[in-house]
């Protein structure tokens, strides 16, 4: 279910402050965050945000195509190692 339009997008207030600080100073410092639920706004474009995936911080460079998506979408939490295959498959 989508978020109500009258509420607007959720962005963690500390993350918003850090991005604004980076933009006004002209720095490109990496911003670390645990807020995977924060929506990417146009202010974030051009910034690198390190999003926590439960184990480590995954750097995400924000482009215009990412606006409107959530940060967690670009930092996978599960690593798929493949299904178990049959041993000696095809050998006779």
From Swiss-Prot:
In terms of InterPro entries, this protein maps to: Ribosomal_uS19, Ribosomal_uS19_bac-type, Ribosomal_uS19_CS, Ribosomal_uS19_SF
Q: Which Gene3D superfamilies match?
A: 30s Ribosomal Protein S19, Chain A
Where do the segments described as Disordered lie?
73-92
Q: Which domain of life is it from?
A: Bacteria
Bias type Basic residues, positions: 80-92
Q: Name one GO biological process term.
A: ribosomal small subunit assembly
| Cited HAMAP family | Ribosomal_uS19 (MF_00531)
Sequence similarity: Belongs to the universal ribosomal protein uS19 family.
What name goes with this protein?
Small ribosomal subunit protein uS19
Instruction: Please name the source species.
Output: Christiangramia forsetii (strain DSM 17595 / CGMCC 1.15422 / KT0803) (Gramella forsetii)
